[in-house]
């Protein structure tokens, strides 16, 4: 796969963009937004942990840079609901930052993150998965959505 930037680094970059661009957008602060942000963060972490456990249970690689080393197609657990729960978890974490620090800018940067990950991570991963798992992956793609 051509992509060499690990998705957690991409998430960190967009998270920093959300935080440091807050002075360019109107400020919306409230206890409700902070609480929703905390809930979003906990959901994101839970999704990530669940996805990693599913990978480990199938004894396959978690490393998105070396997707070619995948030894099995994970379709159980949280992967029944999303083909990309790791990236979905990262979106929830960015939404947490959005709700807590920068509502308008955060929404923009979270959308940009989703576009970036879709084009530069998910699309190349799915090409590799097609080659590795053929019809099994094609069937999985038909039955489970990309994000949620």
Please describe what each predicted stretch is:
Residues 84:
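Extended, alpha-helix-rich binding/interface surfaces that flank or overlap catalytic cores
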Residues 1-76, 88-148:
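Membrane-anchoring alpha-helices and their flanking helix-loop junctions
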Residues 78-81:
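Generic transmembrane alpha-helix motif of multi-pass integral membrane proteins
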């Amino acid at each position: 796969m051509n992509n060499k930037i690990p998705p957690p680094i991409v998430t960190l970059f967009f998270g920093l963009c959300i935080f440091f661009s807050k002075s360019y957008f109107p400020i919306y602060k409230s206890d409700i937004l902070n609480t929703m942000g905390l809930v979003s963060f906990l959901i994101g972490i839970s999704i990530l942990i669940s996805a990693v456990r599913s990978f480990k249970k199938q004894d396959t690689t978690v490393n998105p840079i070396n997707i070619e080393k995948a030894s099995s197609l994970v379709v159980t657990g949280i992967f029944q609901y999303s083909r990309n729960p790791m990236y979905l978890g990262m979106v929830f974490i960015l939404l947490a930052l959005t709700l807590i620090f920068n509502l308008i800018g955060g929404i923009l940067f979270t959308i940009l993150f989703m576009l970036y990950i879709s084009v530069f991570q998910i699309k190349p991963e799915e090409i590799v998965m097609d080659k590795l798992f053929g019809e099994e992956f094609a069937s999985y793609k038909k039955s489970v959505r990309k994000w949620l």
